[in-house]
């Protein structure tokens, strides 16, 4: 890394395990400066509950970034709306969570931070606070005015991107259009090259229907939509294999010769990845004008403040973001 970079972290739902995980992250040295967008008392109280040392240093944007030393975090303060009891949701803190996301996103857009790592949020409490909220991915897409974003989850062994995300199953077929596939594959291909350092990405593409449509006998979306798009993009030089039946695609003879899989919908691709690497996975938002990674698990309210939360996914998300920073320099 040419110079030390700043990475901003949002712990997510304050009553959940996000603050625990951030405190655990602070127990080791990092080659980047970790700027945590959060309430100071929340972090120090959670550190005390866990019996872990934590010193908060003020964020100084005009000073050179410094590698993070063990037992410390750099704090960009955002005040809680209500006091927090670990494991107990408070509706007003839905506003607090969104404020942390907005500040972190804006800092990435204005060049303060090289990447953003997000902890788990509770979508229900944010919506209960009167803020329409579908998820991190959609929030950052809108705030950054990105034309289109793509959700990808990854472990060390497997990357799975989604053509559609949070749609009811009955709406998926209508959503799979030539325009959508062109856009999604272009973003996936571009970010695999620029953020992952893969010169010529090899992408496996799932069919939509069982057996990838069985030659049109089990649905015609492959023939009518997916195959023509893949043929066009192959003619432009992209290395695309598919559409392949999703029930047989996830095996070594295919995956060993691929850099990523494109699934047509959420529950087509993610169960395989989460079964293979739950707790080690990372959620990446492709298509944003900055690097964003996230844990692949929820708020786990019942574990908050107990010292039982596994920091593995957060560590993996941060390490991946650091690698992506290097690739983009």
Curated annotation (Swiss-Prot):
EC number: 1.1.1.262
Subunit and partners: Homodimer.
Protein name: 4-hydroxythreonine-4-phosphate dehydrogenase
Molecular functions (GO terms): 4-hydroxythreonine-4-phosphate dehydrogenase activity; cobalt ion binding; magnesium ion binding; NAD binding; zinc ion binding
Record-listed a divalent metal cation binding positions: 166, 211, 266
Gene: pdxA
Keyword Lipid metabolism: no
Example GO BP: pyridoxal phosphate biosynthetic process
GO CC, any one term: cytoplasm
Catalytic activities: 4-(phosphooxy)-L-threonine + NAD(+) = 3-amino-2-oxopropyl phosphate + CO2 + NADH
Transmembrane segments: none
Gene3D superfamilies linked: Isopropylmalate Dehydrogenase (3.40.718.10)
Known function: Catalyzes the NAD(P)-dependent oxidation of 4-(phosphooxy)-L-threonine (HTP) into 2-amino-3-oxo-4-(phosphooxy)butyric acid which spontaneously decarboxylates to form 3-amino-2-oxopropyl phosphate (AHAP).
Residues that, per the record, bind substrate: 136-137, 274, 283, 292
Alphabetized UniProt keyword annotations: Cobalt, Cytoplasm, Magnesium, Metal-binding, NAD, NADP, Oxidoreductase, Pyridoxine biosynthesis, Zinc
Main location as per UniProt: cytoplasm
Highest taxon in the source lineage: Bacteria
Misc note: The active site is located at the dimer interface.
Subcellular location: Cytoplasm
Family of the protein in this entry: Belongs to the PdxA family.
Needed cofactors: Zn(2+); Mg(2+); Co(2+)
